[in-house]
UniProtKB/Swiss-Prot annotation:
<protein>
    <recommendedName>
        <fullName>UPF0149 protein XCV3523</fullName>
    </recommendedName>
</protein>
<comment type="similarity">
    <text>Belongs to the UPF0149 family.</text>
</comment>
<dbReference type="InterPro" id="IPR036255">
    <property type="entry name" value="YgfB-like_sf"/>
</dbReference>
<dbReference type="Pfam" id="PF03695">
    <property type="entry name" value="UPF0149"/>
</dbReference>
<dbReference type="InterPro" id="IPR011978">
    <property type="entry name" value="YgfB-like"/>
</dbReference>
<dbReference type="GO" id="GO:0005829">
    <property type="term" value="C:cytosol"/>
</dbReference>
Amino acid sequence: MDLPDVTAVQHESRQLALASSAAELHGGLCGWLSGGGADSADWLARILADSGQVAPQQGGALDQLRQATVAQLEDRDFAFELLLVEDGAPLPARTDALFDWCRAFLGGFGLAAQQRPALSEEGEEALQDLARLAQASSEDFDAADEDDTALAEIEEFVRVAVLLLHGDCVMGPRFRQRLN
């Protein structure tokens, strides 16, 4: 299932008077789900820690974002994608969006997992690496082609790290529960 267009997510976010970018919303949602948080229509209230937050309109871009993200995280072909910024955005905007995504992921993951979850050694390392990325900024990159390639590699790393953490916190326990 494909993610909705980033512009549609941003538009609906503005309609709900949210201060978060599309990248931050997707990062928070991914963190929430990867940390074991429930897939529910009121996901915005949960990741924003605001019980008064209105649930996204059913069938709207934010609802589609939730549904597609859940499907992608559960996909056996590892089809998970990051929702960052519009295609063709300048390198600084793309790097800022990625680092914002990582910060929001950590927030959502922390809200869902709360106490320290049982992570594999690789999961621990992935979480630490995501925390380091969350501290970075676009100033760490130049507009050179090498940095464009480096950013693509970092995006791929983040994608795999999220799938690993989701596996540790959601898929592993689910599998163990079926065995018992």
